[in-house]
Amino acid sequence: MDPNCSCATGGSCTCAGSCKCKECKCTSCKKSCCSCCPVGCAKCAQGCVCKGASEKCSCCA
């Protein structure tokens, strides 16, 4: 369970715009939980690694 997210990892949940998930793996999470991922990136909620603040993450390149 992500301490910043009210849902179980990989569980079904909805993340609001104020979601502070750092490692959000919720299948229904619609926002980008990764600062370098665009909102709507389908793979972002499955776990991604940011290469840098201004770079795209490994799963959204």
From Swiss-Prot:
Does this UniProt record's set of keywords contain Hydrolase? no
Q: Which residues bind a divalent metal cation 4?
A: 33-34, 44, 48
- Binding positions for a divalent metal cation 7 per the UniProt entry: 50, 57, 59-60
Q: Which GO terms describe its molecular function?
A: metal ion binding; zinc ion binding
Keywords of the record, alphabetical order, are: Acetylation, Cadmium, Copper, Metal-binding, Metal-thiolate cluster, Zinc
What SUPFAM superfamilies does this protein's entry cite? Metallothionein (SSF57868)
Where is the segment annotated Alpha? 30-61
Positions contributing to a divalent metal cation 2 binding: 7, 13, 15, 26
Instruction: Provide the residue positions that the database annotates as binding a divalent metal cation 5.
Output: 34, 36-37, 50
Task: Give GO BP annotations, semicolon-separated.
Answer: cellular response to cadmium ion; cellular response to copper ion; cellular response to zinc ion; detoxification of copper ion; intracellular zinc ion homeostasis; negative regulation of growth
Q: Which Gene3D superfamilies match?
A: Metallothionein Isoform II (4.10.10.10)
Record-listed a divalent metal cation 3 binding positions: 15, 19, 24, 29
- Chain residue ranges for the region called Beta: 1-29
Q: Where does a divalent metal cation 6 bind?
A: 37, 41, 44, 60
Family of this protein? Belongs to the metallothionein superfamily. Type 1 family.
What name does UniProt use for this protein?
Answer: Metallothionein-1E
